[in-house]
Amino acid sequence: MKFTVARDVLAEAVSWTARALPVRPASPILAGVRIKAEGDELTLSSFDYEVSANSQIPATVDEAGEVLVSGRLLADISKSLPSKPVSVELDGQKVTLVCGSSHFTLAVMPLDEYPLLPAQPTGIGAIDSSTLSQAVSQVSIAASRDDTLPLLTGVRIEINGPAITLLATDRYRLAMRELDWEPADTSIEEVALVKARILQDVAKSMTSGAKVEVGLSGESQPGASSLIGFTAQGRRTTSTLMDGDYPAVRRLF
């Protein structure tokens, strides 16, 4: 594997992909970021069995290939590089990064032990990125931070045709925001419960594009899904949904 990529493009993509890596991963392999060089682009991926992130960026690929390296170390190195093209090459069990006079070496992690990322859920509609960001910011502040009540750490998403409702409560506060979106099917009805911190991260990191595509998959029964996905500007992320019966707070409005 051998490629050249712009420093700023690489640093931003690595930072975004590695942002959700666990500080204390259940397995050391989950601290890695997978880099795939193919065609005229790089694909960077991370996964911790709950949240996956995937970012595609343009690059000059001389030799196609795939490798797994420490995500946080790669992020730190990328940010410290000068503003010049970065040359990356796989040499046996190490990856070398050369940028101007800077030279770094990263140990390779066992790629065959890395879990497969979940497939991106089928898109069910799109929403303006700034509208989503504002709504999540307004509602998520009411979500609980007490992990002893896990359901209340989530934001309930109710989809009813062309309308989406976000709800959150910590038993003392209650927030709701209704907003319009562009559903693929105007008769769609879905409910999803997403951890507030994950939804906040998505809303903050996907504001550069005009639209964010939303997807749901893994339906176990009508109106119920197990995975939610968001796609925007070459970035894709998925999250498992929370299980359980959310308090019936809708009737209070």
Question: Which ranges hold each PLM region?
Answer:
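Structural preference for solvent-exposed beta-strand-turn elements
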Residues: 1-253
